[in-house]
Amino acid sequence: VEPSITTAPLNDAAPFLYYAQSGDMLSAVAARFGVSESEIISDADLTKTTLIDPGTLLVIPNRINEPTTPNVQLLPDAEFVFSATSIGFDTEKFVKDQNGYLSSFRDYLGSVGWVQGYDAIDRLSVENSVSPRLLLALLEYEARWVRGQPIDLLHTEFPMGFNDYHYKGMSVQMTWAINNMSIAYYGWRAGTITHIEFPDGTRLRLDPRLNAGTVAIQYLFSKLHSESQWSQIINPDSGFPALYNEMFGDPWARADLVGPIFPPGLIQPPLVLPFEPGAKWSFTGGPHNGWGQISPSTYGQSHSIYSAIDFAPAAAKSGCVPNDAWVVAAAPGLVIRSENGV
């Protein structure tokens, strides 16, 4: 008897007609749609640049055979990162004008001591490259800190609702939220995130056509809310997007004014190690996230935000000691910020 041959079931659904978004890489798009790179068809040469030019039409087989999140864009990428849309936004003035709990709140930061709450928001925005508007909207949605008073004692001490004594206080709560959103945002860019998981273990596949900013929002709210609550939160007419519009106006209009984050035709420039040719330095650590620790027990075993590697010049003593060796730029460009820890 000849053995029977079983073939995988075919999905008869029509292929996706997907228009590339700013920041899309071929490998990441393939991972999000669950296909191989060679199966993606386009009239454009997708290997010519590091990123696919925005608006490029891609024909992609439909291999999605499981429930997905809604294909509704909630937040443009330019309103997630600390981009040109934040130019001119005065966090202190906005918070004081709202006259809520945050306007008189002070927080303690280990690096600088006691600071005003709005200054802490600005610091978190700059250090993590996240829009201050987004942080304020999250703080208002979850805890009513910006325009009123905390909704209860839990949200006074844990404003994002993450009830863990290691994360007590506004800045550490916002750091928790930022880290989760960044895991999703950059994971979507890299093609390493495809699903969200709710507290009860239920999973949903992220619609592959979403932008990274939307994925960050969907991912964060799935961490502490049930699927039914989450569905209400992401409702653009009555949930978090509606609150965001109410507080700050149309984010998509601001994003359109500044254009895509990544210009068309972008090619990754070559990078060099950050020390002079011939100098002896040691590779001392990394890759790791830029600020604090991404604990696997909090964020999951497979998630991190790789943004830094560590080098140290040769020295007579071990440990952190002053050194006059030059640090050089990894690529041509402007130095736009130099502070402690940077």
Could you say what each language-model-derived stretch is?
Residues T49-I52, N65-P67, R133, A143-L153, ...:
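Secretory-pathway/luminal and periplasmic proteins that interact with or process carbohydrate-rich
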Residues N163-T284:
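Non-catalytic cell-wall polysaccharide-engagement segments
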Residues W252-G341:
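Surface-exposed, glycine-biased beta-strand/turn segments
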Residues E2-S36, T56-L58, N62, V81-R123:
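Primarily a LysM-type cell-wall glycan-binding module
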Residues M25-A28, R32-V35, E39, D53-P54, ...:
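Extracytoplasmic/secreted proteins, especially bacterial periplasmic and envelope-associated proteins
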Residues A31-V35, S42-D45, I60-R63, V126-V130, ...:
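Sec-exported extracytoplasmic/periplasmic mature domains
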Residues E79-A120, E127, L134-R209:
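Peptidoglycan-targeting cell-wall enzymes and recognition modules
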